[in-house]
Amino acid sequence: MNLVGENLSYKLTEELQLRKISFNFEKGKLYTILGRTLSGKTTLLKTIAGLLMPDSGSIRFEDKNFLEIPVWKRNIAMVYQQFINYPHLNVFENIAFPLKQRGLDPQKINDEVFKSLKLVGLEGYEKRKIQELSGGQQQRVSVARSLVKNAKILLLDEPLVNLDYKLREQLREEFKNIFVNGLSEESIVIFSTTDPREAMELNGEVIVLDEGRVLQVGAAKEIFENPKDLKVAAISNDPPMNILKVDIDSNKIKFEDIEIDIPDHLSKLKDKHFNFGIRASDIELNSNGFEFEVELAEISGSETLLHLTRGNAKIITSIEEVMDFKIRDKVKINFKSNKAYAFDEIGNLVSSPFGGTNV
C-alpha cells in the first residue's frame, strides 16, 4: 500500500505551516519536496515521522491509520540537516547502533554495516572516530545508519545544506545511486531541498511547496520545462528565472528601449502585455547585444553570476566560467528568445518553449 496523506493542516501559534496538503507516495520510488526556506518542508517530514501531530487531515500507510501508530513503531529512518552522530562511537559503531538495538546476530550486523559503508563510499573508515571525519563524511555516516535500518520510509531533510559547494555537487551525483541501489522496492524515499539542482539531479517525482501549499507535482523534467506559474518558475530555478514585464508590438517583444524578435512559440499570443520569463543560462554575453550595467558579480562554484540593470529592468545572467567584473562595468548581452516563457498578468504559464501552458 502507498503512503497517502489527505488534507493535512498544521498550525504553529497563529501561522499555518501546512495548508490542506495531500500526497500519494508509492513504494519503490524517490520523491523530492522542493521549496524555499519556511515553505513547510520540514514540518511535512516531521508530520510523516510522527514528531508533529497535524491539526487536521489523515495519513494512511499499508492500510493503517499512520497517525495512531507510535513514532518508534513507524519503521521510519530520518536524516537531518545537521550531522547527527554519536560522538563517543566510531564509524562502525554509529552505523551498527540501530541493528544492535534490535538484537540482531553479530555477523548479520557486520555484513549489513559493511554493505552500507560500501554504498556510501566509506570503506576503510569503519574504525575512525566521528571527530576525525569531514562534514561530508559525517553526513555519509548518518545516511549509512539510516540505510542499515532497512526502513520502509526514509526521510531526508535538506541533508546537503550544511556542506560546501564542491561537496554538495559530489554528493548530489552520488545520492541518486545510493537511494536507488541501497533500498528495497518496498521503501519510499522522500528528500527535501531548497536547491532545484538537487531535485533535477535526483530525477524523481517533485512536489513544489510554498507557504504550506502544494503548487505543482510532476516529474523533475516536467517541472523544469513547464512551471505552471511564476512562483513555481522562481522556486524551480537557481538563480530564479528572470521575469520582465513586456509588450508585443509589430512582431517585437518590447521593454525599456529594447526590442527583441518574437520567437515562433510566442507569436500567437492574444494578450499584448505579459511577463517574459528567461533563465539566467539563456542570456549570453555578445558584443553585438544590448548594453547593461553590472550591479553585482558573484562567483558560484565554477560559474559567474552577473546582476545587470538597464533603466528599470533588472536581470541575472550566468556565465560558465570564472570571470572578473566590477560594479558599473558595461556588458553587452543577447536573449535566447527561443528559450523564453510567457506568463499572463496574474502569473499563470501561457506558453513555454516546450509546449506547456496553464490557461
Task: Give each language-model segment a name.
Residues M241, K252-V359:
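Non-catalytic connector elements of ABC transporters
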Residues M1-G5, S9-K20, E68-P70:
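A short, flexible loop at the N-terminus of ABC-type nucleotide-binding domains that lies
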Residues G57-N65:
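Conserved ABC transporter NBD signature motif
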Residues N75, N90-K228:
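ABC ATPase nucleotide-binding domains
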Residues A49:
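Helix-to-loop junction immediately C-terminal to a conserved catalytic motif
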Residues L34-R36:
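The feature captures the beta-strand-to-loop junction immediately N-terminal to the Walker
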